[in-house]
């Protein structure tokens, strides 16, 4: 190992010398790599925001096992099933409780701007804890009142005046699907790609927003398991006991994964973000290849001279790969810094969870290294054909 390090120290950094000799060409190359990195960072950031924002409610549900309709695709497209299945589920050994939850999209009028937008309405039993959101659990008495709701203060839109009124102890009235409601409290959950915010109230108030819905048709069944029982074991018992053509039994982890898988594989927007990452990678490969190919053509006589002096192809290839690694590392630095500001800008504009993570930075760095090494491998094909006899 020491001998290898000493050999590296004695070696002339020809790759760096050749790149730095043409500073304008180097700057163009680094700009291209940084652009490719920014494109990959932004697509991965949006993709993560897609998964994160659309699984927030799934992760906030207080349940060991979740019952849904087999026709349900995601949280924005939840079918209903009979509430009787909860009563049947309560008879299965290991089940501590089984509560219902109603979920649906409604059109609500922003009390401040008077503009209409889509928000997700949730109806739950105010006598039981259904969500792992302390702000909601502390205001269950408020939502027992007729037509009283609490609203998501992390919703997308202009609500500063509304939240100031509520924080001052005042109630705010507005319309939801042509019905007047009172907003008497707030909590924090966040917007998603499917809804600009969330309204929460009692199951009775929810059903008033949906007069055509039957109280016996629910969207979610929240099952809690007794101490000493494994959720997976109880879930298997529920699958055997309940008709699988009418209700689908999921553990908490499976319930979250179902939502994420929908946006990954079935949603067009998930495919678009993945395609964007691939396009960024290909743009980087093309840019780095053009730079390295131009460098090989410009110094083909020098490379032929090295061959005439007895240096093998491996030495010459090492120079090209040295250039590729230098370009990858130097190009990654601005490619990492710029998205930090863009993430903050996008998060403020959309209220979506867009932020940098260490894992994502390492992934893009690895992709950048692969991108540059791949470009170097393509560019070296011409180098191997450099023949001193043809040059001189």
Regions found by a protein language model. Name each.
Residues 231-285, 294-298, 306, 314, ...:
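Peri-transmembrane interface segments
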Residues 23-50, 266-304, 326-332:
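Hydrophobic alpha-helical transmembrane segments of multi-pass inner-membrane transport and secretion
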Residues 1-40, 51, 56, 321:
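N-terminal Sec/SRP start-transfer signal
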């Amino acid at each position: 190992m020491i001998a290898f390090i000493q050999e590296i120290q004695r070696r002339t950094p020809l790759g760096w010398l050749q790149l730095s000799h043409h500073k304008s060409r180097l700057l163009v190359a680094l700009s291209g790599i940084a652009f490719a990195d920014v494109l990959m960072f932004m697509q991965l950031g949006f993709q993560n925001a897609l998964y994160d924002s659309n699984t927030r409610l799934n992760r906030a549900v207080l349940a060991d096992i979740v019952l849904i309709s087999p026709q349900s695709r995601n949280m924005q497209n939840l079918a209903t099933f009979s509430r009787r299945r909860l009563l049947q589920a309560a008879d299965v050994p290991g089940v501590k409780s089984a509560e219902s939850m109603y979920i649906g999209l409604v059109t609500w009028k922003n009390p401040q701007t008077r503009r209409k937008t889509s928000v997700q309405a949730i109806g739950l039993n105010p006598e039981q804890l259904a969500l792992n959101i302390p702000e909601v659990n502390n205001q269950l008495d408020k939502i027992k009142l007729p037509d009283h709701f609490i609203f998501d203060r992390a919703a997308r839109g202009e609500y500063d005046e509304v939240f100031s009124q509520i924080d001052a102890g005042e109630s705010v009235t507005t319309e939801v699907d042509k019905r007047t409601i009172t907003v008497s409290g707030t909590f924090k959950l966040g917007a998603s790609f499917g809804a600009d915010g969330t309204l929460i109230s009692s199951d009775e108030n929810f059903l008033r927003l949906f007069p055509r819905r039957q109280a016996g048709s629910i969207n979610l069944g929240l099952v809690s398991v007794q101490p000493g029982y494994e959720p997976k074991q109880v879930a298997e018992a529920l699958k055997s006991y309940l008709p699988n053509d009418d209700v689908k039994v999921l553990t908490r982890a499976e319930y979250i994964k179902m939502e994420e898988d929908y946006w990954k594989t079935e949603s067009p927007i998930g495919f678009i973000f993945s395609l964007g990452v691939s396009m960024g990678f290909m743009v980087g490969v093309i840019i780095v290849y053009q730079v390295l190919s131009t460098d090989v053509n410009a110094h083909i006589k020098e490379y032929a001279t090295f061959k005439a002096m007895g240096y093998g192809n491996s030495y010459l290839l090492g120079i090209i790969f040295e250039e590729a690694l230098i370009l990858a590392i130097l190009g990654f630095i601005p490619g990492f810094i710029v998205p930090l500001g863009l993430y903050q800008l996008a998060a403020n504009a959309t209220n979506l969870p867009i932020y940098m993570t260490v894992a994502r930075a390492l992934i893009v760095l690895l992709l950048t290294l692969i991108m540059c090494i791949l470009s170097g491998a393509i560019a070296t094909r011409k180098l191997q054909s450099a023949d001193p006899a043809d040059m001189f």
